[in-house]
Amino acid sequence: MNSAALNARTASVAPQPQACHACKCRQLLSRRVPPAQRQVECSAIAPETLQDIIVGGAVVGAVSVALYAGLKKDPVPCSLCQGTGGIRCFACGGDGRNATVSRDDLYDSKALGGGVAPPKRDPLGRTINPRDCKVCRGAGLVLCSQCKGTGFQSAF
């Protein structure tokens, strides 16, 4: 082949458009698609643009939260418990212990064998201490139902 024929052959072939990234436009640019349909603009978001959108959204969100937190008022004590977080347990008197515990309550009566019987356990396998007050669970304090023991009213 001479160079004139080679130049004429390459001049008649249009340059192939390049796909921007891995999306559907890559399939449309294949040789199987007729040239009239190959002229397509990709509407997909480039990865760099997507990253800019995510970072920008995170910055705007962080600034919004900081501004909102700065606009909050001073905490107000709970109106129900007057800021104490709860009341002293009425069942144990704030002690957290149950004074009336029998020997049968301490150990499982179904255990066989001599010696000391194993302690009672709840369904999750945790040891139950029968000396703890059942109302306050050994804390000596019943938490306020309005503030959940924080002593302050909800600011939100």
Swiss-Prot record:
Subcellular localization: Plastid, Chloroplast stroma
Binding site for Zn(2+) 2: C89, C92, C133, C136
GO MF annotations, alphabetized: metal ion binding; protein folding chaperone
Effect of C133S: Impaired chaperone properties
Transit peptide is among the record's keywords: yes
Impact when changing C144S: Impaired chaperone properties
Positions with a binding annotation for Zn(2+) 1: C78, C81, C144, C147
Alphabetically ordered keywords of this record: Chaperone, Chloroplast, Metal-binding, Plastid, Repeat, Transit peptide, Zinc
Stated consequence of mutating C89S: Impaired chaperone properties
Domain of life: Eukaryota
Presequence boundaries: 1-41
Main subcellular location: plastid
Gene Ontology terms: biological process: chaperone-mediated protein folding; ribulose bisphosphate carboxylase complex assembly
Keyword Transmembrane attached: no
GO cellular component terms attached to this protein's record: chloroplast stroma; protein folding chaperone complex
Assembly behavior: Interacts with the RuBisCo large subunit (RbcL) assembled as an intermediate complex made of eight RbcL and eight BSD2 subunits.
PANTHER family in alphabetical order: PLASTID TRANSCRIPTIONALLY ACTIVE PROTEIN, THYLAKOID LUMENAL P17.1 PROTEIN
Known function: Chloroplast chaperone required for RuBisCo biogenesis and translational regulation of the RuBisCo large subunit (RbcL). Stabilizes an end-state assembly intermediate of eight RbcL subunits until the small subunits (RBCSs) become available to produce a complete stable RuBisCo complex containing eight small and eight large subunits.
Family: Belongs to the BSD2 chaperone family.
Protein name: Protein BUNDLE SHEATH DEFECTIVE 2, chloroplastic
Chain's gene name: BSD2
